[in-house]
Amino acid sequence: MNQPIELTAGGRPRRFALHLPRAGSGGGIPLVIVLHGNHPDASGQMMRDWTTFDEQAGAFGFAVAYPDGIGGCWADGRGVTTADEAGVDDVAFLRALIDTVAGRHGTHLDRTVVAGMSNGAFMAHRIALEASEKVAVFAAVAGGLPASLCDTRPSHAVSAMLIHGTADPVSPIDGGYSRHLGPNGELRGRTLSLAETAGFWRTVDRCPPGPGDTSATEFSSRITAPGGVGGTRVAAWTVLGGGHTWPGARPFPGAAQTGPQEFDTAEEICLFAEPLLASADSRRLSRA
C-alpha cells in the first residue's frame, strides 16, 4: 500500500510517500523514515528506488516513509545547506510526519527508526538528538555527527547504527570538513570521526565501558557496544574501501557508484532495529 501525503510544518508545505507493509491499517507497527542526501534533484523517491526498504517492510512488518527535503537537502544543523540557510525547520517536519502517520495508521509514536545517507545521515543524528522520545533507533550512513550538535543532550537513549567507508572522499571517516565531489570540493561543516561519533553515542546511551563486541569479514568490521539505557546499542560499521555510498544499493540512472555489495544496508538496519524498538519510558535518561 503506497500513499503520497502532504502536510504543513514550520509554516511550509511538505510531502512524503508512505509505504505500508500490507493493505489497510499499519496499526501497532514501527515506522521507518528514510532520508536522502543533498542534491538539487534528491527526493524520497530516489531513496525508494535505490534501497530495498519497501521489500524489508513486508519482511519485518514496518511502515516506511520517504520524505522530500526542501531544495533537495535537509537543515541538519551544520548551518551550511540551503535548507539551513533558509531557516527550514526539518525537525518540526519529521515530528509532524511521525505524528501524522501514527494518527492515520496507528504506528508507534515512540519507536520510530530513522535512516539516512550523507546529508540525510547528519539529519538522522539531529532528529535522534532533538526528538529522542520519538526515535528509538537511527542509522547514519556516510555521515558522522556534526560538530555543531555535540552539546545537544537528548532526553532519551537512542540506539545507533553508524556505517562509514574508509575511502569516503565527501564525508571522511576520520572526521573534519565534509566536501562535495569534484576537484574544488566545497567545505560543508565539520563532523566527528566514526570512532568519535560512536563514543559520543555510547556516552549518551550510557553503555558500559569496554571494547564492545567485534565481528569482521574480508570487507568490513563492526564493533557493537551493548548495555545502554533501555537496552540500547551503538554499532560502528567500517566498510573497507567503501566510498560515499549506500552499501548494497541498487544501480540507478545517474549514480556514479553503488558501493560494496557485501550486505544490503536496508536489511541490516532493519535487523539491527527490530529487537531495539523500546518504548520512550524505558529509554528515558535520568538527570544527575
Q: What does each model-found stretch correspond to?
A:
Residues 1-31, 55-56, 109-149, 195-199, ...:
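A domain-start/cap signature at the N-terminus of enzymes
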Residues 3-113, 117, 122-130, 246-258:
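Serine-hydrolase catalytic machinery in alpha/beta-hydrolase-like enzymes
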Residues 47, 173-182, 186-203, 212-225, ...:
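Short alpha-helix in the alpha/beta-hydrolase fold that links the catalytic acid
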Residues 144-160, 175-178:
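Flexible "cap/lid" loop of the alpha/beta hydrolase fold
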Residues 162-164, 168:
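Short beta-strand/loop motif that positions the catalytic acidic residue
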Residues 168-171, 244-246:
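Acidic catalytic loop of the alpha/beta-hydrolase fold
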Residues 230-256, 260-263:
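Mobile gating loops/cap/lid regions near enzyme active sites that modulate substrate access
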